[in-house]
Structure formats: structure tokens, C-alpha cells
UniProtKB/Swiss-Prot annotation:
It comes from Escherichia coli (strain K12). The keyword Transport does not apply. Belongs to the 'phage' integrase family. Keywords: DNA integration, DNA recombination, Viral genome integration, Virus entry into host cell. GO terms for biological process: DNA integration; DNA recombination; establishment of integrated proviral latency; symbiont entry into host cell; viral genome integration into host DNA. This is Putative protein IntG. The gene is intG.
Length: 92
């Protein structure tokens, strides 16, 4: 296991959030310390969420159809609730 300067700093500062520690204390390192920068970049890349490079159009279309269906059901239900509550709201 390689221990970096930032690991030591975070341990001494009792930093529990590793990503926050690298973000804050990483700026303390000299800019020309390429080994430390490379180690930090490697560790930070472990926190980055993996993103798909491409999404098939049929997947997008399927999700859009589902979203449209949910929106349609929402509008119908909203109309039902408004119709049901409307007489109750205008009572004196």
C-alpha cells in the first residue's frame, strides 16, 4: 500500500470524508510533485460515477413512453381530485 502525503495529513486531521480530504488538503501539495498528483487523480477517479458512453435509442424511447404514461395518469388523477374537491371548497 502506498501512503501519500495527503493520506498522512487526513489521518492527522482526523478527516473522515476521504474525497473531501483530497479536495481540501490536496491543494497543499506542491504543483510540481507529479507522483502525488498522479496518486490523487487515481484515487479521485475511484469516486467518480461511471457513465455509459452511449444509450441505445430504443431504451430512451421506452423510458419516454413510460414517462408520458405516468404524466397522463397524473393529469387524469389531478382532474378527478379537483372535480371531487371543487364542490367542497365552495361551501359556505
Amino acid at each position: 500500500m502506498v501512503v501519500t502525503t495527503s493520506d498522512v495529513v487526513m489521518c492527522q486531521m482526523r478527516r473522515s470524508d476521504v474525497q473531501g480530504g483530497y479536495r481540501v488538503y490536496g491543494s497543499w501539495m506542491a504543483e510540481n510533485v507529479q507522483d502525488q498528483v498522479s496518486i490523487l487523480n487515481q484515487k479521485l477517479s475511484e469516486f467518480a460515477p461511471s457513465m455509459p458512453h452511449a444509450v441505445r435509442s430504443d431504451v430512451i424511447n421506452n423510458r419516454l413512453q413510460n414517462l408520458h404514461l405516468h404524466a397522463h395518469h397524473f393529469l387524469i388523477r389531478r382532474h378527478q381530485l379537483i372535480t371531487h374537491l371543487n364542490p367542497h371548497l365552495h361551501r359556505n
